[in-house]
Amino acid sequence: MKEKYIVGTAKTSIDNAITKNYNSFFVGFIIDENGRILDVEASAILKITNDFIKKIFIGKDFIKDFDEISSIILKNYLGSSQKSIIVAYKDAIKKYNQSAN
């Protein structure tokens, strides 16, 4: 199998529904052998949140498109987990880079 599954984690605010259900925010990525994001899912409460997150990430390069993806999140994702998505993404990149060594 040439694909990798990587999960990044982040904390969310105490009053966030995700924290009440999961204690943390998780984003799982399936990455192909060329670094393309094939699929992504987050520990979001609403289905529409995951649908929106998928539109942001799928088809992008996991490493090279970090700045573009982060910018899109900051401009267009106005939910309470905005920063948590970016932190979880950074955590997933760290794990991805460690697995390459």
Model-derived features with residue positions:
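Short, compositionally biased leader-like segments
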Residues: 1-9
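Active-site- and interface-proximal helix/loop "cap" or "latch" segments in soluble metabolic
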Residues: 11-101
